[in-house]
């Protein structure tokens, strides 16, 4: 990329900066949840909604982000995304109650939903096609550093300052990013088709109300009748979307996507798989602090080996899949992640704390292999005219399943424990033990989906398919 103009390189730095902000915020909050609960006078069992409100908002808003960027312009939308994210951070820091914090996190989620996909779109427009891969590698590298720094930085700020600072640090960075966006980023627009507002609203309502219903009376305080009503509304909304999308060329997500078997299996496996793995980043620091008495900073440091294992495995995952095939890799990593989850719980409860970093490193390796395999399996056989829609649907499902996973983790804690889990409670470790056993079972379930992947599904299948389509 050395031959790119200076202006283009600065624009890439702005996109990379946005990726870093968004990825840092996904992990920096996890370590601070017990301290937030104490400060706000809430049970730790309710704090999963701090993550759910952000991730669910991202899932709901993702389908609209690309269309808005094409319609209004990438600079305008990227600037708006940074401003909303920064304002959300400010309101999070000023929150005095859990409900105020949840609303502020939702505002952050609107900005986060637009930041990454619009950033990718910007790179496509400002960089020559032959340099696109190198440019995307450059801008996504800070996004990989964010999860590495997030837990430790969050723990450090909580332990030596207060939890408010995990949001306040976004404000000066966001102001600089917003000014740089206005000054340096071009405002590309393009002709767009009419946005499927009806489909968007149906999906948004369906996802939101079903997630709220899943949280149950323990988390939301809704009565059983209200929860049943939410389930009914959510199911009706999703059924109406399916009817709306039939034979509709302008549908938000075409049902033709599901004619590709690997897409259907990959999407179902990704949804179920990320529900299980989505529990781990939330539960691990909570367990370390509340269940084992670790300090916030110590708990944050313990998360670093998991991120390092994930980053290191990305270098060889392609060779692993090509050697053993998608079905074997996905079934093995799914069952392996379940076993590693049990191993983590066992070593922690036995007091073998020096072993935990190695277990978390192994967990990161297994999880990364499974994520990469799920993503490529889902998208690799889609025809070119459906690839963009399929990628958007996968991105939405990834965020939705993570929010459901965190919700289920909070629900499990509520089922096995009282409303006040604390380090001083004699039954706390028992509560966490039953929760982790349940999580290991849920994590293993997608193996049944991945076992249906054809045994001859290798990466070269996608290559040969494209060659045939080009003839």
UniProtKB/Swiss-Prot annotation:
TM spans (from-to): 12-32, 49-69, 77-97, 102-124, 138-158, 165-185, 197-217, 225-245, 263-283, 286-306, 342-362, 396-416, 431-451
GO terms under cellular component: plasma membrane
Pfam family, one: MFS_1
SUPFAM superfamilies assigned: MFS general substrate transporter
Membrane topology: Multi-pass membrane protein
Residue spans, topological domain Cytoplasmic: 33-48, 98-101, 159-164, 218-224, 284-285, 363-395, 452-471
InterPro entries in the record: EmrB-like, MFS, MFS_dom, MFS_trans_sf, Multi-R_MdtD
GO MF term list: transmembrane transporter activity
Main location: membrane
Periplasmic side: 1-11, 70-76, 125-137, 186-196, 246-262, 307-341, 417-430
Cellular compartments annotated: Cell inner membrane
Alphabetically ordered keywords of this record: Cell inner membrane, Cell membrane, Membrane, Transmembrane, Transmembrane helix, Transport
PANTHER family: BLR6921 PROTEIN (PTHR42718:SF46), MAJOR FACILITATOR SUPERFAMILY MULTIDRUG TRANSPORTER MFSC (PTHR42718)
HAMAP family recorded: MFS_MdtD
Assigned protein family: Belongs to the major facilitator superfamily. TCR/Tet family.
Protein name: Putative multidrug resistance protein MdtD
Protein source organism: Escherichia coli O45:K1 (strain S88 / ExPEC)
Encoding gene, per UniProt annotation: mdtD
């Amino acid at each position: 990329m050395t031959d790119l103009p200076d202006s283009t390189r600065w624009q890439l730095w702005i996109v990379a900066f946005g990726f870093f902000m968004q990825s840092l915020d996904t992990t920096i909050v996890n370590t601070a949840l017990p301290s937030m609960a104490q400060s706000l006078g809430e049970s730790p069992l309710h704090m999963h909604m701090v993550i759910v409100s952000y991730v669910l908002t991202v899932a709901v808003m993702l389908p609209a982000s690309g269309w808005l960027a094409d319609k209004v312009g990438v600079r305008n939308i990227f600037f708006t995304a940074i401003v909303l994210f920064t304002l959300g951070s400010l309101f999070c820091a000023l929150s005095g109650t859990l409900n105020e914090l949840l609303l502020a996190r939702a505002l952050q989620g609107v900005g986060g939903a637009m930041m990454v996909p619009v950033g990718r779109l910007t790179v496509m427009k400002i960089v020559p096609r032959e340099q696109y891969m190198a440019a995307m590698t450059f801008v996504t590298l800070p996004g990989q550093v964010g999860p590495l720094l997030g837990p430790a930085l969050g723990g450090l700020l909580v332990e030596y300052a207060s939890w408010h600072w995990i949001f306040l640090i976004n404000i000066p960075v966001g102001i600089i990013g917003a000014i740089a966006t206005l000054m340096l980023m071009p405002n590309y627009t393009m002709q767009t088709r009419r946005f499927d507002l009806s489909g968007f609203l149906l999906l948004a309502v369906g996802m939101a109300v079903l997630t709220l219903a899943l949280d149950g009376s323990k988390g939301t305080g809704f009565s059983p009748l209200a929860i049943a009503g939410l389930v009914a509304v959510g199911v009706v909304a999703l059924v109406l979307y399916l009817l709306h999308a039939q034979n509709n060329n302008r549908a938000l997500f075409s049902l033709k996507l599901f004619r590709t078997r690997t897409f259907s299996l990959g999407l179902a496996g990704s949804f179920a798989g990320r529900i299980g793995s989505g529990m781990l980043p939330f539960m691990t620091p909570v367990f370390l602090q509340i269940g084992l008495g670790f300090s916030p900073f110590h708990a944050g440091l313990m998360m670093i080996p998991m991120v390092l294992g994930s980053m290191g495995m990305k270098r060889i995952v392609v060779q692993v899949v090509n050697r053993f095939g998608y079905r074997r890799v996905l079934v093995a990593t799914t069952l392996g992640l379940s076993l590693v989850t049990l191993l983590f719980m066992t070593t922690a409860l036995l007091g073998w704390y020096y072993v935990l970093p190695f277990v978390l490193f192994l967990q990161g390796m297994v999880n990364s292999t499974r994520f990469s395999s799920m993503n490529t399996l889902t998208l690799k056989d889609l025809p070119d005219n459906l690839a963009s829609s399929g990628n958007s649907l996968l991105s939405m499902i990834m965020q939705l399943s993570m929010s459901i996973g965190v919700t289920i983790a909070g629900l499990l804690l509520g089922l096995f424990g009282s409303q006040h889990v604390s380090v001083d409670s004699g039954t706390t470790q028992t509560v966490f033990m039953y929760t982790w056993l349940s999580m290991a079972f849920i994590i293993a379930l997608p193996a049944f989906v991945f076992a249906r992947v054809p045994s001859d599904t290798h990466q070269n299948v996608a290559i040969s398919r494209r060659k045939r389509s080009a003839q």
